[in-house]
UniProtKB/Swiss-Prot annotation:
Residues 151-165 have a biased composition (Pro residues). The lineage of its organism: Eukaryota, Metazoa, Chordata, Craniata, Vertebrata. The keyword Metal-binding does not apply. This is WW domain binding protein VOPP1. It is a single-pass type I membrane protein; Single-pass membrane protein. It comes from Mus musculus (Mouse). GO terms for cellular component: cytoplasmic vesicle membrane; late endosome membrane; lysosomal membrane; organelle membrane. Interacts with WWOX (via WW domain).
Amino acid sequence: MGRRLGRVAALLLGLLVECTEAKKHCWYFEGLYPTYYICRSYEDCCGSRCCVRALSIQRLWYFWFLLMMGVLFCCGAGFFIRRRMYPPPLIEEPTFNVSYTRQPPNPAPGAQQMGPPYYTDPGGPGMNPVGNTMAMAFQVQPNSPHGGTTYPPPPSYCNTPPPPYEQVVKDK
């Protein structure tokens, strides 16, 4: 009875090992009928009764996904870092030949109105704060050395102090 119990235990142990070891059931067509065969768990079916060892890394889809995400992140970060360190050159605009002429320090009496000049469109009249129409602020000089029109320089606001607050409020 002891030998019989040993044989049954060995048979059950063999069945247990065979059941716990995962196997792949593969098939392929040979003529019109399918042919079945079994591969081990770490092997892939190749088609004609052959089993090929599969790399376990091929089954790790999340590994490949994270690897591709890491590559894309590194490429994107490198692109933005490169753009910040080496900005693209600015588009060159055509150069304008503009020359300024200074007004004479002591103009002839009556040639210029008192008060700061107000710059307007070259084709339209200028208005001073009082409401009087004044001559064009831009004076065209046809004999300019650059061939273009020349205009007086803009007034320098930095050299004069701002008006007092009471005067600004009173003018409004």
